[in-house]
Amino acid sequence: MNRLLLAGWIFFILLSVCTESFSGMVVSQTVAFHFQPHPDLSQFLVMDFTELTVPEAFIQKIGHAFSFFVLTYLLWKQRGSIRSAAAGSFAFAFFTEVLQLFFSRNGCIRDVLIDAVGIGLFYGLYVLAKRRKQEMYEKY
């Protein structure tokens, strides 16, 4: 069951990053792809954070972090290793941002960092929960 959930979540992320318009996918339930065989790869290095002042963009970036929080959890359940799950999630975050450039979307290192916030949040909560569990066992 974990494997199926993981595959479904990966499919959802890939669909979300490759479709022409994420908001079009959500609002009008339209999925369309526009492949760009020769993207401007220099766009990947753009680190413009001013976009985050737009409420819709900020909410979408929260979705980025949440998606990779969930992915890290699902990978951890599948692999059993938090470090492996975090590394796999980070590699997938990097891959999806580069992939977006080939589908007429904005893929950039800034979004990899935002994805890493979700990964780091799960990692931190995992470590915290593990410590608390260990403290409880030592206490009793």
From Swiss-Prot:
Disulfide bonds: none annotated. One of its GO terms (cellular component) is plasma membrane. It is a multi-pass membrane protein. It comes from the Bacteria. The keyword Phosphoprotein does not apply. Keywords: Cell membrane, Membrane, Transmembrane, Transmembrane helix. The chain crosses the membrane at residues 4-24, 56-76, 84-104, 109-129. It is found in: Cell membrane. Its main location: membrane. It holds the Pfam family VanZ. Induction: Expression is sigma F-dependent. May be important for peptidoglycan remodeling. This is Uncharacterized membrane protein YwnJ. It comes from Bacillus subtilis (strain 168). The gene is ywnJ.
